[in-house]
Amino acid sequence: MSVMIEAGALRKRYGDTQALDGVSFAAPAGTVLGVLGPNGAGKSTSVKILTTFADADSGTARVGGHDVHADRHAVRSIIGVTAQDATLDGLLTGRQNLEMMGELSGLSRAEARRRAVDLLERFELTDAADRMVKGYSGGMRRRLDLAASIVNRPPVLFLDEPTTGLDPTSRARMWDLLRELVRDGMTLLLTTQYLDEADQLADNIVVIDHGRVIAEGTPAELKRATGGLVLRVHVRDGVDAARSVVASFATGPVDVTVGRVLQASVAAEPGLATRLVRELDAAGVAVDDIELHRPSLDDVFFALTGERDSSTADDLDPELVYTEEAR
């Protein structure tokens, strides 16, 4: 399988900040590569270099076999880019936006019109085709922006936070559309703040932190590498006592969220739940619920970076959040 996106030992500095410090990854043709990391980790810088909007200080970057520095025009002719903020003209209709993008991409006027009709139908925007985009909902704007990015049928698509701000129904529809593009043979590089999105869509995942790749693999491989189980204890009261008990079982930090839920990674041992219940009871902790489950991608991300999925950040109570290293 040929490699469509390739970054090799990329380095980039902005002033005193080392944005990238030897980042390497690759995406085979017809696959989805998820690039994850905390804010400021280097995700966007990597995408800017690969899409020719920034130059690396050193390292190599190739898209579709073309060097992004030496052959910018060739790279730009085979990629589509969907940014976090939709790049649409709100005073034009959906149809006009697509026709304009088609002509800018080198299609004839007639070809651009035919392509616009096809995309409006495929992305379920036909009924709104002749309305000004400023009146579109967030989900409609996202779908139109995605349609605009593939108007010239690029084999490679870069998506930067494509579903940020969308409701669950609109996000699910976008996922379906992206899956359709991959089935058609397109290669996708996806940055996202939603770990469930990467879990659903990505064939392979790269985790970047402080400008370096700290983990890579399939979602299943990353979960297995985390090891053990994830313990969640919902307590009615006695958070401090519960923290001490959970820490004695944990293999890493104990995370406490709003609603008095304690979470930690634990080793998968026989009789774990029974011993935990016994010790919590002995400590006088009133427990509402105890959960044990295999690690999710959010658990992997937390184990690697110490940060939770930002889409669930509102669940954290700033007065209750703390970590305590396991005894």
Residue locations for each model-derived region?
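C-terminal coupling/interaction segments
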Residues: 269-327
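Solvent-exposed alpha-helical segments within well-ordered globular domains of core cellular machineries
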Residues: 117, 176, 220, 224, ...
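A generic structural signal for secondary-structure junctions
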Residues: 80, 97, 106, 145, ...
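ABC transporter nucleotide-binding domain
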Residues: 175-267
